[in-house]
Amino acid sequence: MGEQVIVLTDLTKQYGNFTAVDHIRLNIRKGEIFGLLGPNGAGKSTTILMMLGLTEPTSGTVEICGINSTTHPIEVKRRIGYLPEDVGFYDDMTGPENLIYTARLNGISDKEAKTKALELMKRVGLEDQLAKKTGKYSRGMRQRLGLADVLIKNPEIIILDEPTSGIDPAGVQEFIELLR
């Protein structure tokens, strides 16, 4: 396998006397697929937020592609595609319009953004929903669009936080197939 792209060293997060994350050590190499498993409240989402540079650890370090996420969170965010548990889109915009907006925020030209948006809508099985406003999308459709939103900036690392939550069993199977 390749170089280490995610390195957590003694990562800890405390809220007062409560320890949400307790000295995690983790190394993930390029090309690996890794899952954080545990019950509700185990610190999975908190760990992800620290990896993204959105929450500062109490102690320990996070390096993403060799960059410290606490001291350089914007640079880390440029390299990561993140799909949160509850995906948010502009409900009055179509799927492609939301994707193009994300692409523009990431410095992708209008021409390339439009091309990639249409390609990704097809890839995630939403090619027949091009004119539909995302406010009318089902939960499964929003998750699919969320995956397209993650992929449009061609990230080095993809982090998914409970990507199949609230999706019916058939939809879960379809979503897993999209990830392959």
Language-model features: locations:
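Conserved ABC transporter NBD signature motif
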Residues: 60-68, 75-76
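Conserved ABC ATPase "signature" region
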Residues: 100, 104, 111-129, 177
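Conserved ABC ATPase signature
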Residues: 133-137
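Conserved catalytic motifs of ABC-family nucleotide-binding domains
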Residues: 154
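Catalytic Walker B motif of ABC-type/P-loop ATPase nucleotide-binding domains
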Residues: 158-161
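Helical segment within the ABC ATPase nucleotide-binding domain
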Residues: 173-180
